[in-house]
Amino acid sequence: MIDFSNFYQLIAKSPLSHWLETLPAQVAAWQRDALHGKFREWERAVEFLPELTPWRLDLLHSVTAESETPLSEGHQRRIENLLKNLMPWRKGPYSLYGINIDTEWRSDWKWERVLPHLSDLTGRTILDVGCGSGYHMWRMIGAGAHLAVGIDPTQLFLCQFEAVRKLLGNDQRAHLLPLGIEQLPALEAFDTVFSMGVLYHRRSPLDHLWQLKDQLAPGGELVLETLVVEGDENTVLVPGDRYAQMRNVYFIPSAAALKMWLEKCGFIDVRIVDACVTSTEEQRRTEWMTTESLADFLDPQDQRKTVEGYPAPLRAVIIATKPETQQSLAKKAR
C-alpha cells in the first residue's frame, strides 16, 4: 500500500502542520473504502519497479533521469512494460533511463508558457490542484521550489506519480494526495497555488476560486490556467451535453470575465498573461495514450470548432495575488 507517512512527518513542523488534524483520517478512509477496482494491479506495477538513483537528473529543462551506464536491454524492457501497465499516460513527457514516455499532452509546452510569468519559485511551498500524474510538480522542484504538494482524486495518476518518483530516487520534494480540493480545510499556508485545467470542470467556478484563495498564505500567488472563449467581461459559454466530447464542462468564461470573477473573490493584481489555442501537436494520440484525442474532438471540416460546433479549445493563464493582512504584514516586518 502506498505510504503517506513521509509526507506527514515532513509537514509536522511546517506551516502545514494543522493539516494533520484531518488528513491522516481522510487518507485512511480512502484506503479503506474508495479504492478503484484496478488499483491493486496498478500498485503492483509500481512495487515491481526498481528504485533507481539517477546519475544525472534534470528537472529544470525537462523530467529526465539517466544512469551512469545504460541499462541492459532486458532491464529497460522490464521497466518499460511495467510503466505501460499504467497507461494511459496523459501528462508529461518523461525521459527515464532511455525510456521516453510520450504522453498525450506536451505539458512541457504549457510549463514554458507559464514559467516566465511566475514569481520566483525558489524556496516556495506549492499546491498543485488537479495535478494529474505530477509532471508540473517535478518542474516546480526543478525551478527551486522547497515542496510541491499535488492533489488529484484520480487513482491511476497517483500510481503514475509514485512510479516516476521511484525512478527518480524516491525524491521526497514532491507528494501527491488522492484528494479533491473540496476535501481540504482552509490551510492558508501555500506560497503559490496552481489550478491548471480544472475550473471548467467545476459546477460552481466561483466556489473553486474561493477554495484556491483559502489555500494561499497572505500575499501568495495564484496561477490559474483554464479554457476561455473570446468576448468581454459579460461573455460566458455554458455548453450543452458535451464540449469537445467532454461531459463535465460547465462554464467557459472569457478571460475578461474570469479576471472580473477573481477580483470579485478578493484577489488583487489580476493579470491575463497568456492565451493560446490548443493544437493537435500539443494534445494527440501516442503510443502511451492510444485512445481518442484532440483531433477526434474537432470538426473535421473546420478545426476552429469542436465537433459540437463550439469554439475550439483556447486556454488562458491568469496570475493573481491574495492580499496581505495586517497580521501578515506585521509578521514580515519583525
UniProtKB/Swiss-Prot annotation:
<feature type="binding site">
    <location>
        <position position="105"/>
    </location>
    <ligand>
        <name>carboxy-S-adenosyl-L-methionine</name>
    </ligand>
</feature>
<dbReference type="GO" id="GO:0008168">
    <property type="term" value="F:methyltransferase activity"/>
</dbReference>
<dbReference type="InterPro" id="IPR027555">
    <property type="entry name" value="Mo5U34_MeTrfas-like"/>
</dbReference>
<dbReference type="Pfam" id="PF08003">
    <property type="entry name" value="Methyltransf_9"/>
</dbReference>
<keyword id="KW-0808">Transferase</keyword>
<dbReference type="InterPro" id="IPR010017">
    <property type="entry name" value="CmoB"/>
</dbReference>
<feature type="binding site">
    <location>
        <begin position="152"/>
        <end position="154"/>
    </location>
    <ligand>
        <name>carboxy-S-adenosyl-L-methionine</name>
    </ligand>
</feature>
<feature type="binding site">
    <location>
        <position position="315"/>
    </location>
    <ligand>
        <name>carboxy-S-adenosyl-L-methionine</name>
    </ligand>
</feature>
<feature type="binding site">
    <location>
        <position position="200"/>
    </location>
    <ligand>
        <name>carboxy-S-adenosyl-L-methionine</name>
    </ligand>
</feature>
<feature type="binding site">
    <location>
        <position position="110"/>
    </location>
    <ligand>
        <name>carboxy-S-adenosyl-L-methionine</name>
    </ligand>
</feature>
<dbReference type="InterPro" id="IPR029063">
    <property type="entry name" value="SAM-dependent_MTases_sf"/>
</dbReference>
<feature type="binding site">
    <location>
        <begin position="181"/>
        <end position="182"/>
    </location>
    <ligand>
        <name>carboxy-S-adenosyl-L-methionine</name>
    </ligand>
</feature>
<comment type="function">
    <text>Catalyzes carboxymethyl transfer from carboxy-S-adenosyl-L-methionine (Cx-SAM) to 5-hydroxyuridine (ho5U) to form 5-carboxymethoxyuridine (cmo5U) at position 34 in tRNAs.</text>
</comment>
<comment type="similarity">
    <text>Belongs to the class I-like SAM-binding methyltransferase superfamily. CmoB family.</text>
</comment>
<feature type="binding site">
    <location>
        <position position="196"/>
    </location>
    <ligand>
        <name>carboxy-S-adenosyl-L-methionine</name>
    </ligand>
</feature>
<feature type="binding site">
    <location>
        <position position="91"/>
    </location>
    <ligand>
        <name>carboxy-S-adenosyl-L-methionine</name>
    </ligand>
</feature>
<keyword id="KW-0819">tRNA processing</keyword>
<dbReference type="GO" id="GO:0016765">
    <property type="term" value="F:transferase activity, transferring alkyl or aryl (other than methyl) groups"/>
</dbReference>
<protein>
    <recommendedName>
        <fullName>tRNA U34 carboxymethyltransferase</fullName>
        <ecNumber>2.5.1.-</ecNumber>
    </recommendedName>
</protein>
<comment type="subunit">
    <text>Homotetramer.</text>
</comment>
<feature type="binding site">
    <location>
        <position position="130"/>
    </location>
    <ligand>
        <name>carboxy-S-adenosyl-L-methionine</name>
    </ligand>
</feature>
<dbReference type="GO" id="GO:0002098">
    <property type="term" value="P:tRNA wobble uridine modification"/>
</dbReference>
